């Protein structure tokens, strides 16, 4: 099935910036079980040459989620977001993310293919700091399938996840 909107080559700029919070860094580190002292202590971060807490490597997924939600709120691709799953992701880090950083995000639709009745979309996601320096780039592969209902999914409020029901 083809996507309703031709998104190939589209560039989506998130309309706002994201400020990395000191306590967000700590909370995220605890949540993903990262125990390096530079995530919790300014002194430990300073020992590594940084002037603020360092965020765990996957911290930028918080901003990435905002960008994807904003994209799907504004671009009608012709399917519900519950029918879209992330099948791959690769990160390329250029600079550490520090507490207090002001980050900007852009999502480029790198490729769109149709295989076996599913749409495969690869995005290149760029995260820059307030000086315009590239902090991180990620390549994300999403798969969406419009429905014959063969993959029955629903939102489970208790677990906070999308689950397969059949």
Curated annotation (Swiss-Prot):
Which one of the record's GO molecular function terms can you name? (3R)-hydroxyacyl-[acyl-carrier-protein] dehydratase activity
Q: Which Pfam families does this chain map to?
A: FAS1_DH_region (PF13452)
| Superkingdom of origin organism | Bacteria
Coiled-coil segments: none
Q: Name one GO cellular component term.
A: plasma membrane
Question: Tell me, what is an example of a GO biological process annotation in this record?
Answer: long-chain fatty acid biosynthetic process
NCBIfam families hit by this protein:
PRK13691.1
Query: Which PANTHER family does its entry note?
Result: HYDROXYACYL-THIOESTER DEHYDRATASE TYPE 2, MITOCHONDRIAL, HYDROXYACYL-THIOESTER DEHYDRATASE TYPE 2, MITOCHONDRIAL-RELATED
Q: Which family does it belong to?
A: Belongs to the UPF0336 family.
Q: What is the recorded name of this protein?
A: UPF0336 protein Rv0637
Q: What is the lineage of its organism?
A: Bacteria, Bacillati, Actinomycetota, Actinomycetes, Mycobacteriales
């Amino acid at each position: 099935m083809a996507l309703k909107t031709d998104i190939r080559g589209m560039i989506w700029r998130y309309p706002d910036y994201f400020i990395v919070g000191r306590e967000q860094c700590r909370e995220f580190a605890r949540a993903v079980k990262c125990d390096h002292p530079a995530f919790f202590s300014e002194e430990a971060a300073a020992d590594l040459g940084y002037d603020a807490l360092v965020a765990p490597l996957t911290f930028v997924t918080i901003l990435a989620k905002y960008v994807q939600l904003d994209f799907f709120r504004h671009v009608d691709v012709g399917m519900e977001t519950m029918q879209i799953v992330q099948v791959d992701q690769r990160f390329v880090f250029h600079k550490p993310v520090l507490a207090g950083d002001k980050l900007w995000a852009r999502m480029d639709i790198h490729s769109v293919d149709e295989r076996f009745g599913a749409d495969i979309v690869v995005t290149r996601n760029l995260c820059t700091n307030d000086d315009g320096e590239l902090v991180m780039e990620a390549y994300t592969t999403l798969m969406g399938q419009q429905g014959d209902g063969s993959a029955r999914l629903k939102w489970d409020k208790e677990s906070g996840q999308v689950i397969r029901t059949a």
